[in-house]
Design a protein with these regions (language model features):
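Beta-strand-rich domain onsets/edges
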Residues: 1-7
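Surface-exposed coil/turn segments at beta-strand junctions on protein surfaces, enriched
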Residues: 2, 36, 46-48, 79-81, ...
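Residue-level detector of short, conserved catalytic/binding motifs and their immediate flanks
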Residues: 7-9, 53
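Structural motif
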Residues: 9-17
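Conserved short hydrophobic patches within well-ordered secondary structure
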Residues: 19-22, 88-90
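Tryptophan-paired
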Residues: 20-63
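Beta-strand-rich cores of mature extracytoplasmic or soluble domains
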Residues: 57-121
């Protein structure tokens, strides 16, 4: 039997396009406007631990579905004690970063650079 964890999910979209139909391992995770601040929280999503994980999303302008270019893993050893949030950070080059936090997630260092460069900090 696979080991699972229930976490609150936040999505941060650092692209210049709205995206929707975000799906992590077959589980719908909503959408996000361009340069999204991560204000939407999806509560108590259950995720399989391990990997690799599959993440896809659709471009709201073109409808094109994109799959994350890099491998994604949800591992206990990457989580702080008392973890409550998984944040999915989607970047313009179609790579994704997963972060795990006890409190509400903030932009990654890479995300902060993108937001500053685009005037969306």
């Amino acid at each position: 039997m696979k080991k699972t964890i229930a976490l609150n999910l936040i999505i941060r979209n650092y692209t210049d396009r709205s995206i929707f139909n975000i799906i992590l391992n077959g589980c719908g995770a909503g959408g996000a406007p361009p340069y999204n601040s991560g204000n939407s929280v999806y509560v108590d999503y259950t995720f399989d631990l391990g990997g690799p994980q599959t993440l896809t999303w659709r471009d709201a302008g073109t409808g094109v579905t994109t799959t994350a270019k890099n491998p994604l893993y949800i591992r206990e050893e990457d989580m702080p004690k008392g973890v409550r949030y998984l944040c999915i950070h989607i970047y313009p080059d179609e790579t994704v970063e997963l972060t795990f936090t006890v409190g509400r997630p903030v932009p990654t260092a890479r995300g902060a650079i993108i937001l500053k460069a685009t005037g969306n900090e």
